[in-house]
Amino acid sequence: MNVKLYALIVASSCLFCCIAEGADLKQSFAEPPLKYATRPLWFWNNTAVTEEGIVEQMQAARDKCGYGGFGILPFGKGFKPAYLTEDYFKLYGAALSKAKELDMTMCIYDEYGFPSGSAGAIHGDGVRRFANKHPKGTIKRLDKHEEEVTGPCDWSKKLPAGRVMSIVGMEMKGKKRVDLTGMIKDGKVAWRVPKGTWKMMIFVCVVDGDPNVDYLDPEAVVKFVEMTHQQYYNRFKEYFGNTIDGTFFDEPTMYRAKGRMWTGRFNDKFKARHGFDPAPYYPALWYDIGTKTQAARNYLFGFRAELYATGFPKVIQEWCDKHGIAATGHQDQEEVVNPVSVSGDLMKCFKYQGIPGVDKIGGRAAERFYKVISSSAYNWDKALVMSETYGAMGDISWETIYHVAMEQYTKGVNQLIPHAVWYDNKKVSFKPELSWRHKKYAEGLQLYNKYMSRLNLMLQNDGRHVADIAVLYPIATLQAGHYLDGKLGHYKGGVAIPEADYVDVGEMLSTELGRDFTFIHPEVLDEKCSMKGDTLRLNNPVNHESYRVMIIPGHKTINWSNLKKIKAFYDNGGKVIATGTLPRKSAEFGHDEDVVRTIEALFPTSEKAAGESGRASASGGMAIFLKRPTAKALRDALDGMQRVYDVEFEEGKELCYIHKVKDGKHIYFLANLGKTRVNTSVALRGTLQPELWNPHTGGISRPEYSHGKRGTVDVTKVRIDLMPTRSTFIIAPQEE
């Protein structure tokens, strides 16, 4: 099944097509059906689970909390019955039977504990089920063995254990490299070292010892899926595509194996993809190898990110497509600015996954990265964006619960999975316990689920996202500046990239200026974007977007192919803003001079200390460089480039928002995430007949509004009055 069809069979997605069959949208908004409610993770935690307990808790979850289903998460050493045994599946079957009776839906959580990939070894019962059965299918690590020698001399070395990936000698002063990989004989490598100081390096791929599946190897992942997902299908086929509508994976990551995750067939697959041998470039994974460092790292780290994306998530997605259900899940440590040895590429890792996801957990600033994940969905034309939300945040207030949800939905999330309900509420490991048994939450959960159901009704759809601003996702500069064994440690990404201001720029746009945007992946800019007049178009069948401004956040290295297209956009009348640091290097071999020349053509005074510079093209294009980007500088630059944006707020009265277009309707969701009341006039491009739909109450009203023009552009001004942590929809038919 094509992944674009996944949402049609997912009850939790609640696409508009699900409403259309005779149902009245306004009536559904007032009293949303159960299928739009949230479905929390349900921890079967550190206790013996019984059929009686399952039935009782599911009934209460629906009747007392308004939940629409669950994702069952076996957890802890005390959980019984044993994972993946027939007794376990008997209980799971009881849960499915009760869910069907209650008209609830279920999502298969693919692990015992977390992260996904070991079948119980971590946060489960400690049994390494996958590793015990498939020891060669577990995570691999790239090791480097090195020594310095002074030539001329004879050098020889017995090969260390593991699969040899590369052997290179590098002269330390001039960075000359000699590939010795083909000189292996009888388990040794020998070479006559020329004059100079040389670093002799042997790179080997070894089994790490981590119990998780090799995320980079699709064949290994197939074996994991056979051990887990397939076992549910073998027993519960009749529930697939109805009661069971999806799977969920949790926290795979490449920071395992000391951040040096690798796989044995890396070189062979690299050659097949790129047409040249990566072995001579392996030293760049750790060291500066001269002028080719940045491009070499982009090829090597970029290909590892591709293997990661086509490994674990893609294999699971393909299995789900075949079995009529959806697939979602999220990475670990999404909050790391440099993801190269964590998720590899926080946009591309979701390229082949039907529903990209994120985890709002503890005090981590996941909200700064929601737009990266939702932009991945927009880039690759996906309807849904999931968030596992509230875990380990403690007994948070209702205000915080709503605030988090509003921020997520204004930034593109549209499938919130609460964390969590606990089978044994006396053994809660990660608060809050969001159930009828908790005094703080019991009375408010029904109201909360009605609110979330209304958000889902309106936003869980394949409507087209509208944004005037594109921001280039700077994976090229992140990969170019990255190296293995960085001083930050693998858990925090290893290496800080000083020019990487993309997260700050994104937050300025979203939370300070009230300007929505889409991160554009370099691959998508090359393959799916074209120019139409002075706009840049993202050419997706469903989520097609038109950008009037392109922002290049801080880069030292950029894809030459991207820069050529951005320059053509500027020449055609497009508007370009660059921030912080301008690129001087190409992510492709042989194009550094092209990058320098083009940047100078766009920003001729780019290195002046004044901080702002640029020029205009003959066709009306503008290019501005903000050396020290602030919210004010960014606002001034944007206002000078475009007369009217899609949505505009009065300065100092900005709200967070998202705008989608679906079935002839404009759907604007606005939220006040500040601490003071906002009474303001919101300017919407076009001549609209707006209504206010209140997700807190289900009420619908006609606001105060007026029509006017800015220059030749039609504008509708709508009066909005929102208290802190309150939200509203503006719904309007598309103008003729």
What are these regions (language model features)?
Residues 1-5:
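Positively charged n-region of N-terminal signal peptides that target proteins for export
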Residues 144-184:
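Extended, Lys/Arg-enriched charged tracts that mediate electrostatic binding to polyanionic substrates
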Residues 30-46:
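Boundary/entry segment of secreted carbohydrate-active catalytic domains
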Residues 20-22:
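Boundary at the C-terminal end of the N-terminal hydrophobic targeting segment
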Residues 173-235, 711-736:
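Extended acidic/polar, glycine-enriched regions
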Residues 7-17:
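Bacterial N-terminal signal peptides
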